[in-house]
Structure formats: C-alpha cells, structure tokens
Regions:
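Short internal alpha-helix immediately C-terminal to a glycine-rich phosphate-binding loop
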Residues: 1-38, 78
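Generic hydrophobic/aromatic pocket-lining and core-packing "Φ" positions
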Residues: 8, 32, 53, 99-103, ...
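A generic alpha-to-beta junction signature in SAM-dependent methyltransferases
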Residues: 11-13, 80, 93, 106-107
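Adenosine-nucleotide cofactor-binding segment
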Residues: 21-24, 36-101
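Residues in the short beta-alpha loop(s) of Rossmann-like NAD(P)-binding domains
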Residues: 48-49, 118, 141
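C-terminal hydrophobic helical "lid"/dimerization subdomain
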Residues: 100-104, 143-195
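ADP-ribose/adenylate-binding Rossmann-like module
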Residues: 104-120, 135-136
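Rossmann-fold NAD(P)-binding glycine/threonine-rich loop
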Residues: 116-132, 144, 148-151
C-alpha cells in the first residue's frame, strides 16, 4: 500500500483530478486506493486482466482501459476534458512501454509519479520538456506513510489486503512466485507459522 500511495504523492494527486494508473499489479491497485484517498474525481485503471479490473473498480477505479499502446492512450485521453490527457499518472510497472504510455497520456502540466523499478526505460526529454510534464518518483518511504495508512486500514476506510489472492507457507515460496508470474495471483502471502 505504501508504494501505491507514494506513486500518488509523487504524481501530486489532488482533489478533483483525473488520474490514470498504469499497471494492475498490487502496487497499481493500491495506487487506485491512494488516488481515491487523495480526492481524485476520476480514476482510470489501465488493466488487461478481468480479476484485477474488478478489484480495481471495487477500490475506486471509475474506468478501466484494457488496451495498450496507441489505442489505450487514445481511449484514456477520450475520457479527459477535451481529450488533453490526465492531470496525474501513476506509473507502477517500470517498463519502457509503461513509461512512454504514462508520458503520452499526461496533459500539459501533469506529473507522472513513477514507482515501478525501471528496466531499460528511456525518458524522451524533449517530449516532457515541451509538454511540461513532470516526472517524480523513486523508492517509497513506507515508514513515513505508515501512520496514515494504518489508521485508514484500522478505521475500515481502506482494505489493501485484498490484493493478496494466494496464501501459502514459506516452504512453497517458489510456487508463490510462479503464481504471481503466471498472473494466477495478484500478490502472494507467505505464512511463516500458523498463529
């Protein structure tokens, strides 16, 4: 939850914003929760997986775009005021394609909050310079967000634990990773011991 919240903070999400979340893993889904917490009026989740789309909607996504590339970008922009793009983008993947999408759907003056660990990402400096798109991000300072987020969980305002769709013991850690890799689990929960 802390990393998804960090993406929203880095994207400078504020009340009334139209926000896009690129990535439907646990971090992206928690980014949906965070955008809602920060007052976004419209939250667009880019997701190709039915189970994640459903959970994203339950978490607060108002729209889901399953397409990628230019078609996905066009569909996101079609949901914005005059098609100019979103106010804030949460980039929660770390691939070059996801970063390019994030930049392409951002309106002039928007901010991309990136928390996906970058893998061969190229930043098109001229595009962000002339498009006046800001990029902020990095590792999440989760301890800084813990009091706020834990309070929201304990009050029942949010339930990010729903991203754990598979539970097993430490002895089956390889299976836990395989299930996530094969998109059979959003996030695996490892039980060290039964309490």
């Amino acid at each position: 939850m802390g990393t998804g919240y960090h993406a929203a903070v880095m994207a400078r999400v504020k009340p009334g914003d139209i926000v896009a979340v690129v990535g439907d893993g646990a971090v992206g889904l928690c980014g949906v929760i965070a955008a809602k917490m920060l007052g976004a009026k419209r939250i667009i989740l880019m997701s190709r997986h039915d189970d994640r789309q459903a959970l994203g909607r339950e978490f607060g996504a108002t729209d889901v775009i399953p397409e990628r590339g230019e078609a996905g970008e066009a569909n996101v922009k079609a949901l914005t005021d005059e098609g100019v793009g979103v106010d804030a983008v949460l980039e929660c993947v770390g691939s070059d394609a996801s970063m390019q999408t994030a930049i392409n759907i951002a309106r002039p003056g928007a901010t991309v909050g990136t928390v996906g660990i970058p893998h061969n990402v190229t930043i098109p400096f001229e595009k962000i310079f002339f498009g006046t798109v800001g990029i902020h991000g990095g590792p999440a300072p989760t301890r800084a967000y813990a009091p706020l987020l834990l309070d929201a969980v304990l009050k029942g305002d949010i339930n990010p634990g729903r991203v754990f769709t598979y539970a097993t013991t430490l002895d089956n850690i390889n299976e836990a990773y395989q299930k996530m890799d094969q998109r059979q689990a959003i996030k695996s929960l490892l039980k060290i011991s039964e309490v």
